[in-house]
Each structure stands twice: as C-alpha cells, then as structure tokens.
Amino acid sequence: MKKGLVVFFAVVLLLAGWIFGSYNGVVTANENVNGKWSQVETQLQRRSDLIPNLVNTVKGYSAHESQVFTDVANARARLAGARNVTEAAQANGELSGALSRLLAISENYPQLKANTNFIQLQDELAGTENRLAVARKDYNDAAQAYNAKIKSFPTVLVARMMGFQERSYFKADPQAQKLSLIHISEPTRLLSIS
C-alpha cells in the first residue's frame, strides 16, 4: 500500500513538473515574441517620425505633388491605427509604397536631390528601413519558434489547456515590395545613426 502511494505521488509530481516546465517554456517563448514585436514597433515609429520632416522637405520643392503627400499621410495614419500584426504588415506595405513615390519625386528636382537635409533624411530613412528589416526577421523567427513549440507534442496539450494561440507572421505585401524599389541616380551616403 505504501509503495503504491509513493509511486502515485511520484507520478503526480513528475506530471506536475512536466506541466509547469512546459507552461514556463511556452510563456518564455511568448514573451520573446512580444519583445521582438516591440522592436518592430519601435522601428515603425522611428520611420513614422522621420516622415513629416521628409514630406516638408519635399513640399518645399514640389508643392503640386499633393496626392503623394496625402497618400503618405493616410498610410502613416493606417499604420498608427493598426491593431495587430496583420494590419501592421498591410499598412506598412502601403506606407512603403507611398514613401517610394515620395522619394521618386526627387528625380524631377535636382535642387532637392542636392539638399543636405533631404540627403540626411533619406540616409536616416534607409538606416531605419534596414533596422526594420532586421526587427521583422527577428520577430518572424521568434514567432516561428513559439508556433513550433505550441504545436509540438506533448507541449501542445499544455498550450491548448492554457489557451495559447498561434502568432501571426509579419508578411510583407508583395505589391508593396514591387512599389518600394527606388532608383536614385546618385548613390547616397550612409550615416551611422544610433
């Protein structure tokens, strides 16, 4: 009788340890995804903060390009109002396309292309886009690891019991990727911005 009770408690303790360990592993992976998403949001905000200065600089040279300015403002507002990863990815694609059209305006205005403020803003935007690409990749890697963890047996049992859901990937809109190709005749300098 005592031996059976000891075995029973040992099995219960092992099961409880496995449940707690699995739960903590899923929580850790989920928090990693949240942290990586925060980095994406930081870079999206940094880019969004650069846009008004860039728009104002371009406006000084090409006030008649009002549709492009409106498109940039609307896309920026949609990105700020995004409620989840999917909406943010879609709004980011729209903003990238609008920014591409804004930067393409510089081809028609040699004085704008030579403006040091424009060049610096363009360099800062390029650096931010690079940091954003890294943050998106890190987020997607973390989301993939989390999703794999909550789908693998036996952790899937704990994940379902505790209500953990699959995380969305930050997918770039293929149309926006085509629009974001910018051809600038003069190479820009790269600044080290921290």
Model-assigned labels for residue ranges:
Residues M1-S185:
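A helix-centric hydrophobic-segment signal that preferentially recognizes long
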Residues I182-S194:
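Single conserved hydrophobic/aromatic residue that forms the stacking wall/gate
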